[in-house]
Design a protein with these regions (language model features):
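Helicase P-loop NTPase motor core
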Residues: 30-38, 42, 269-272, 277-371, ...
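Conserved helicase C-terminal RecA-like lobe
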Residues: 160, 299, 344, 358-370, ...
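Acidic, low-complexity intrinsically disordered tails
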Residues: 1-3, 633-724, 730-733, 742, ...
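Conserved helicase motor core of SF1/SF2 NTP-dependent helicases
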Residues: 32, 220-309, 426-430, 437-439, ...
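Conserved helicase NTPase motor core
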Residues: 2, 7-18, 22-26, 36-37, ...
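Inter-lobe coupling/hinge region of RecA-like P-loop helicase motors
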Residues: 2-10, 14-18, 22-28, 53, ...
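Conserved two-lobed SF2 helicase motor
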Residues: 83-88, 192-193, 547-554
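Conserved P-loop NTPase-based nucleic-acid remodeling module centered on helicase motor cores
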Residues: 54-141, 146, 150-162, 169, ...
Length: 769
């Protein structure tokens, strides 16, 4: 049977599966069967006598970990290999070694909302203006520090950066508050384990001995903390197999370091490198479009992607007049395919760069009766009623959890107001108590009146009754909470229709608890359930078998595949995102993101943009994404939108590249990657790439034929310019060169900042600074 399994693998896949000793780097292109390789390699390790307890497989999503676990079980029934996400693995390690980092083993994992509450309290106590220094910005800075293994003591602000100075003050206070509550945020899970392994050699050696074979999926997405953990666990037994693709590294904004995979061969000179280049997912046309696009990136490891699938249809590129036309046309097309019986709803996926772009699609699909699902697994656990019930459970599990106590002490209402809570907090701070400990002393707090003290004492008594059930099955604990707190009754008595929906959501949470109880038989079921609820991923709620159209961001689409994919709003400022402007590394990541979106498609792919789009409260003309210039013309079908009077038509999309001057050919610009830029003009067919798409004048619908265009090079940083519609403005940023040279202009008229492609632009310099 095993020989048949091996025969089903390609030579490259088999090479990876049979390499069992020493480091291994598997460079796996999209749709190349990497999960199959990982699971077969685990099965092969088991066949060669490696105990299951010595094998650790790490990935990034619960769905991927569950799929890996199920496939290993199929190949090697009865073998319990630990397949886990990084965060869940670190949470388990921390519970086993909590005292080493100053925690109790029943610590609470705070989600983003809970962490923000702690941060806001710290800012208030430190008398820092949250309007000037928002909790979100400070939280992002602290997260960056933790992902880069900078503790509160090690963090140093850069000179002349006010926010950094504030973070240097707040970070230690924030960490102290977390430790006092025996709590961690998501980033702490990694930071604490990395520092624990660094500072405790015996613990590190013990864990290295325990996990003698480590496999890491999606290695290109690891940050410094994850990299450090993996390195620390593979010193004595360097049997580390990592799988990944530098071309699919799309999480730099949350700390992922592309160098981890690019430099793997430097870290492990004796490494075996295996390339999985055959794609089993997409048509030849789709794969050629993706491969051509990603060729413009410089920080990558070249692969020769190929497929034996059919040639397939051309990739469609559609320009719509507005985002409403875009949404309605896509919805109508999907509805027609479903009605004709050619496709099921689950065959379709619509991707976008940011969630805010989904609204018009939702309306359009709903109007046509097309069932759809939004992929956001976090959404359920962020609902008020769910967070309320989970807060009760957190407090039962960890009495020092001040954030959870503040959420539930007056929920449902118990006549415990803000003034009472402030006095409790003051008492707790004075005597270094948790809020629950302070509440137990409410009768001794002189500043509390008798009524308030009695109300607090009643809550403490309620808590004590609930905590008796801490070791019971989770569904049973939840039932006691709903009944004894009066929470269910409070919602049932409400005449608010929204509260009836909340009851339905609570029933769903009870179902989740019941399913957990049926499959988990270890110690501390409540602790494990809360850990699972806290470490939900975006895609966990996505049901692959649910017969609905899927709407999701391209980040969430990672690792998935669909027969038909639509990618909307391929426009400058959205894809690539505006924050990548003038940042080559971020621009390459945006290109990788589009590459990921394209390679999710199996049979059909459409990219689209709208000439006018309402976004963030503004109606504006758009600029086509520069990535559209990088797609291979021969594989594309450009479709114009109606009416024909729109400011920019797709018929003008393709210029005759043969008529361009040599230095204006897009793929010959100086900023094109070396591996894309030909050494001679005959080294590459000139019809391979798109010509420049349009001009700012076209987009604005202005006739500038009577006035000669100003050369793009004439515009300089700081120049004051005149626009026929927006008036006077100042150039605040420049990017690109030649026909791609673009300027961001801040207008004095209140029009805000707008970006223009300068070739034949309506902008005119007033003066040059």
């Amino acid at each position: 049977l095993w020989s048949k399994q091996l025969e089903s693998l390609t030579p490259a896949q088999r090479e990876a599966v049979e390499h069992l000793e020493g480091p291994l780097l598997i460079l796996a292109g999209p749709g190349s069967g990497k999960t199959r390789v990982i699971t077969h390699r685990i099965a092969n390790l088991l066949r060669h006598g490696v105990p299951a307890r010595r094998i650790l497989a790490l990935t990034f999503t619960n769905k991927a970990a569950d799929e890996m676990r199920a496939r290993v079980e199929q190949l090697s029934p009865g073998e319990a290999v630990w397949t886990s996400t990084f965060h869940r693995f670190c949470a388990r390690l921390l519970r086993q070694h909590a005292p080493l980092v100053g925690l109790n083993e029943n610590f609470t994992i705070y989600d983003t909302g809970d962490s923000r509450q702690v941060l806001k309290r710290v800012l208030a106590e430190a008398d820092i203006d949250a309007a000037l220094y928002s909790p979100e910005r400070i939280a992002a800075a602290i997260s960056w520090a933790k992902n880069n293994l900078l503790t509160a003591e090690q963090y140093q602000p850069r000179p002349g950066h006010p926010l950094g100075s504030v973070v240097a003050r707040v970070y230690p206070l924030y960490q102290a508050r977390l430790l006092a509550s025996s709590a961690v945020d998501f980033d702490d899970l990694l930071l604490h384990v990395a520092t624990m392994l660094r500072d405790n050699p015996e613990t590190r050696a013990t864990l290295d001995e325990r996990y003698q074979q480590i496999l890491v999926d999606e290695y290109q997405d690891t940050n410094l903390a994850q990299y450090t953990i993996v390195r620390a666990l593979s010193i004595d037994h360097p049997n580390l197999a990592v799988t990944g693709d530098p071309d699919q590294s799309i999480y730099g904004w949350r700390g992922a370091n592309l160098s981890n995979i690019l430099d793997f061969e430097k870290d492990y000179p004796e490494v075996r490198v295996v390339k999985l280049e055959q794609n089993y997912r997409s048509t030849k046309r789709i794969l050629r479009v993706a491969d051509h696009l990603i060729g413009y990136n410089q920080r990558r490891k070249k692969k020769g992607l190929f497929t034996e699938n059919d040639e397939g249809q051309s990739v469609r590129l559609v320009n719509y007049p507005t985002q409403r036309d875009e949404a309605e046309s896509i919805a109508a097309e999907i509805a027609a395919e479903i009605r004709a019986g050619r496709r099921r709803p689950r065959d379709f996926a619509i991707f976008y760069r940011v969630n805010a772009l989904s609204r018009s699609l939702e309306f359009a699909l709903r109007d046509l009766g097309v069932p759809y699902q939004m992929v956001n697994g976090l959404e359920f656990y962020q609902r008020k009623e769910i967070k309320d019930i989970l807060a009760y459970l957190h407090l039962i599990n960890n009495p020092r959890d001040d954030v959870s106590l503040l959420r539930v002490i007056n929920n449902p209402p118990r006549s415990i107001g803000k003034s009472t809570l402030e006095k409790l907090a003051e008492h707790a701070g004075r005597y270094k108590l948790s809020l629950l400990e302070a509440a137990r002393e409410s009768g001794l707090i002189e500043s509390l009146n008798k009524r308030a003290a009695v109300a607090v004492a009643k809550f403490v008594a309620l808590y004590d009754r609930l905590s008796i059930h801490a070791a019971a099955p989770v569904e049973e604990i939840m039932g006691h909470v709903l009944a004894e707190t009066g929470y269910r009754q409070f919602l049932e008595d409400s005449e608010n229709e929204e509260d009836q929906d909340r009851l339905a959501n609570i029933e769903e949470l009870l179902t989740a608890a019941r399913q957990f109880d049926e499959t988990h038989f270890g110690d501390s079921p409540l602790e494990s359930f809360l850990e699972e609820a806290c470490l939900v991923n975006d895609t966990d709620a996505w049901a692959a078998d649910d017969d609905r159209v899927t709407l999701m961001t391209m980040h969430a689409a990672k690792g998935l595949e669909f027969p038909v994919v639509y990618i909307i709003a391929v426009e400058d400022g959205l894809l690539p995102h505006e924050r990548s402007r003038d940042n080559p590394e971020q621009l390459e990541e945006e290109r990788r993101l589009l590459f990921v979106g394209i390679t999710r498609a199996q049979d059909q792919l459409q990219l689209s943009l709208a000439t006018r789009r309402e976004f963030r409260g503004q109606r504006r003309y758009t600029v086509p994404s520069q990535f559209l210039m990088e797609l291979p013309r021969a594989e594309m079908e450009a479709i114009g939108a109606t009416p024909a009077s729109q400011p920019w038509e797709v018929e003008g999309y393709y210029s005759d590249v043969e008529m361009l001057a040599e230095d204006e050919i897009p793929w010959e610009h100086d900023d094109a990657p070396e591996e894309v830029r030909p050494t001679t003009t005959s080294a590459r067919p000139r019809t391979t790439s798109f010509a420049p798409l349009t001009t700012a004048a076209d987009l604005a619908g202005k006739d500038t034929a009577a006035r000669p265009a100003v050369p793009p090079e004439a515009f300089v940083q700081g120049a004051v310019v005149q626009h026929p519609e927006y008036g006077l403005g100042k150039i605040v940023a420049l990017s690109g060169s030649g026909l791609r040279r673009a300027a961001t202009v801040a207008f004095a008229s209140g029009a805000g900042e707008k970006k223009f492609i300068l070739a034949n632009s309506p902008l005119r310099p007033i003066k040059v600074s």
